[in-house]
Amino acid sequence: MNNSPTLSNTRNRKNNNNNSNSNSNSNNNNNNNNNNNNNSNNNNNNNNNVNRNVNNRNNNNNNIINVNNNVSSTTMNMAKDFMNWNDGIIEREDTQLQQQKDRCFKILKKSTIACIVLLFISCTIIYSMTQYPSVSGGDAGELIVVAHQFGVAHPPGYPLFTFLGYIFSHIIPSNTLSVAWKISFMSSMIGSIASIFIYLTVYLWVNNHWCGLLSAYMFTFSPLIWMYQIQGEVFSMNNMFVAMLMFLGVWYTRVRIFENERYNTAFWTSERIAYLSAFSCAIGLTNQHTLVLIVIPFAFWLMFISGRDQLWNIKILSNLVFYTLIGLSPYLLLFITPKLNRVKYSWGNTSTLRGFIKHFLREEYGTLQLYGGDGGVISLFTKISIYIENLIIQFGYIGLALSLIGLLNLLLGYNIRTFKWKSFGTMIIFSFLFYITFFFNLCNLPIDKPLYRGVFLRFFMQPNVIISITMGLGIKSIFGFLNRIQRDGGTAATTTTTISKIQKYLLPIIIILLVGNQIGFNYNLQDQSDNYSFYDYGHSVLDGLPRNTLLLVGGDLVTNVPMYLHLCEKVRPDIDILSMEIMSWEWFKITQSPLFQRVKFPGNVYHPYIPDGYSLKDFLDANINDRPIYIGGDFKSGDSSFQNDYYTISKGLTSQIIPKKDSHKFNTFKIIKTTFSTFPSFHIPNNTEKYPNDSWEHFMMEEMAVSLERAAETLLKEYLSQQNTESFKALELSVEILEKALTYVNDKCWSLKHLGICFDHLRYRVVQNVNNNNQQAQNKASNYSKQLLYFWKKYINQCTHEENTDQDWETIKKVIQLI
């Protein structure tokens, strides 16, 4: 806005000259000087200059002061520029803008309060009706454990979430509701507050409740948002802070505009809104660091564009710094918590300055990395394509079209035509593009793998806040455009009537239909109220363990879910659960190992290749004679030291670690046969539409299948080379186990291949050990051949990605051709 006057506070520019222009003649309409008469004869004047009356605070006689018409007109244009109102589509009549001016300092009118209450109650009720009844997958188990115990979460700590989670998990007086449900309910309520901020943003922007409700509901009940806001995760609060910053930007802009036209007697001046914005930016960063990608463009716009003439003085800057530090204060909990409340499964040694900085900067993962391993090389274009495809899933074609119209209106409207790049709409577009380009370039997740693709998708929620806001702007743009067409083509009377009817009936009907479709289409897909699968999975891991077992775990699912049941719901208090991931950090010896009195740690850290480190073999040697040791999930990669002295026998979802010198004491076939007969049986979420391959439910089913594959692998290693009755039974048992594995995941390549191997060996043994004239044996061998052919054909057709790594690939193809 190169031609717009500099914004300044009305306190400094108020006119105290009560005699200026008060006696001007009423016939000066055509006079080129800038003094205009406030005489009542000007009511019929057709010129477009608008008289502004400013109340003089020092005038006890309430004398009216006339403001210069040119200044008034320029201020009006400036207002439209800042809010993208001057683009010819989202257009306001002067009288409408005057009404907004009169009400700008009073956001919470009765109608607004009614919409806020409606949003909060409806969203919270629907969310609570569809929540997980207990623990869910991913990081939720760990975050709930840490929040309930008031510990420190994985880097960067999430102190705001854990603090509020601790309050919610203890303040709700109910023994029937699980700890996980209580913290998930907190997320649901916070998600409802995010919806309120989205509504207020759009409402303050276009002055239409229905447009605000459309944006709020479409966002709240989009599949991705719904999924993560009904479980104990940090994303719900992060969405709330993104929406809050959008709201504060619009609010600050409006108050600044109208402070130039009259003295603001309300509490919330633009200066105080700036302080609130600083506090909100800071406290939002104590929940999740990805908010910084929204904070950076927002803070730049606030300090260097919209408030550059107001906020750059020592007093205000000092206050902004003060409120920023207050907002960051929850990070003090990372210092205090380890000293006052040492609990199991709490991360880091944050009680020291070095430990705090290391945790805050996520140095253990890589400060600017989401993934600690070697991520896949995926182009930015591919990632953006995935995002656009996902937008269609989230909002449908109509919702995406409305968002596109809203974005184009901001991008190609008055801003570009007159280079008004300083508007709030421009800031929103820049924030969206900044997040998309910066984060997608930063993301090093191997998204070619389904589970990590799901992790990648959850970071779409922040830009989706902006997309939902532009949806409300888009539908308002359409109706504004239709209004202009009718205004240009009809008489004044008919136009007014038509516009009124459109606004009053058609807009609400369309919005109700869109919102109803969004909720109705996604409700069943997001309803997790009966999903006890993770709860049952955790019990299946823990319930079969012998008394006083030491359970080593590796992997998020097999760690977080059993840990939640053990520490929050006090399941199996006799056992100890140790995460091999946490054992490998240097701080474990200081903060965690003292809490495990019955466990011996033969060094400072679980790392076989550093001084004072120890290997898994050293750890097992120190503890194997004291208690049973089981492993759940995977061993730590890079440490094979134990393999010469220990082996494992699969027992359900875990495996017992046994010294090889004691192997004669165990009959592998009988043990696996017994445990397979009692293999966990619970409701499996096998609805592929509801639980696609990037969901934690699908990953859990894969873990179930892998546990069965481990049992079959143990049998095959021991019995495949043997030629006796027990080995034949072991092969038959392996077939049963692998066929069950395929009921969980029907395209498990390892199972398909080794089923063929089992049938090949069974066929060979039948043919070799019985008389060829035995028809029953021949039929049995023929059946084995058919089964071999079926599974190996399926393996070749479905597992083409194994061709370059499987040395048996060509052999299997030749066998298929021969049979």
Swiss-Prot record:
Pfam families in the cross-refs: TMEM260-like
Keyword Transmembrane helix: yes
Topology relative to the membrane: Multi-pass membrane protein
Lineage of origin: Eukaryota, Amoebozoa, Evosea, Eumycetozoa, Dictyostelia
GO molecular-function term, one example from the UniProt record: dolichyl-phosphate-mannose-protein mannosyltransferase activity
Function: O-mannosyl-transferase that transfers mannosyl residues to the hydroxyl group of serine or threonine residues of proteins.
EC nos: 2.4.1.109
Segments traversing the membrane: 113-133, 152-172, 185-205, 210-230, 232-252, 285-305, 316-336, 391-411, 427-447, 459-479, 505-525
Name by which UniProt lists this protein: Protein O-mannosyl-transferase tmem260
Biased composition (Low complexity): 15-68
Reaction equation(s) it catalyzes: a di-trans,poly-cis-dolichyl beta-D-mannosyl phosphate + L-seryl-[protein] = 3-O-(alpha-D-mannosyl)-L-seryl-[protein] + a di-trans,poly-cis-dolichyl phosphate + H(+); a di-trans,poly-cis-dolichyl beta-D-mannosyl phosphate + L-threonyl-[protein] = 3-O-(alpha-D-mannosyl)-L-threonyl-[protein] + a di-trans,poly-cis-dolichyl phosphate + H(+)
Keywords: Endoplasmic reticulum, Glycoprotein, Glycosyltransferase, Membrane, Transferase, Transmembrane, Transmembrane helix
Segments of this protein annotated with the region Disordered: 1-68
GO cellular component, one term: endoplasmic reticulum membrane
Enzyme class: transferase
Location of the protein in the cell: Endoplasmic reticulum membrane
Principal location: endoplasmic reticulum
UniProt-listed InterPro entries: GT117_domain-containing, TMEM260-like
Biased composition, class Polar residues, residue ranges: 1-10
Family of the protein in this entry: Belongs to the glycosyltransferase 117 (GT117) family.
GO BP terms, alphabetized: protein maturation
Species assigned in the record: Dictyostelium discoideum
Residues the record marks as carrying a glycan: N18, N38, N70, N349, N531, N686, N693, N783
